[in-house]
Amino acid sequence: MLSAILLIPAATGALAITGLRLRQRRRYRRLESQQRDWITQYGAAMDLPQALPEPVPDFQPRIAVLPQPLPTPAFDALREAALRCQHAERSYFPAHKQGGTVAYEDLHRLAPEIVAFYQSGYVRRLCSAVIGQPVAPTPIHDQSSCSLLFYDRPRDHIGWHYDHNFYNGRHFTVLLPLVNRHLKEDRLSSAQLLIRQDGHERAIPTPPNTLIVFEGARVFHKVTRLEANELRIVLSMTFCTHPQASLLKGALRRCKDVAYFGIRALWT
């Protein structure tokens, strides 16, 4: 009798989450339809180049840096869209991470230009050329597929880590710094992207309009602390050779996303 009573709240909770996930799937289908319109609308406004930058950097160390990958009008449009997003979700993990994030789903409402850029053929072709394999954006239900990382308070940072791969194919992180500056002095912020390879640490340059492509599951990396009167906003995008996932990997991804985007990640 007691066990039956205890099962009632569990079953109710499972049904509630299932209902929320079904409703969210319908919403995602609508957003995917909007994406196609945005690619046409904002892609034309940004006037992304047809030709890729040359030469393409070597990706053998699993990380590559491309300075100035975007024409000024396209970059300015992305930066202005990011600056409109003033309500990032803050997360704090003692001794590891502090900062703000604007999730992929929220960008559809707050900055559709950024969504159109992520889904553009130019970015996909550029990343594929750098990596040496065809890649595609990760799914719309993954809140980390395309997000803004806000470092806007002193001590914002993230410690040493790998990016978990929850997909069947190889998984890549692509960063585009949109703002990286001291607010009172003419210099970059104190926050630095560091990687550790073969027992050595090195800093990766992150001035605005620099594209950093790396295989996060293989490259150990961190971002050092921001100081007072500094601002760093980075567009983070993920691409994959095979963006499909098993049920187990999907469940693990949602659990991870709870730490960054709250309980709503469970029904994405």
Task: Give, region by region, the residue ranges found by the protein language model.
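Short N-terminal helix-initiation segments at or just after the protein's N-terminus
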Residues: L110-V123, T138, L175-D186, G250-Y260
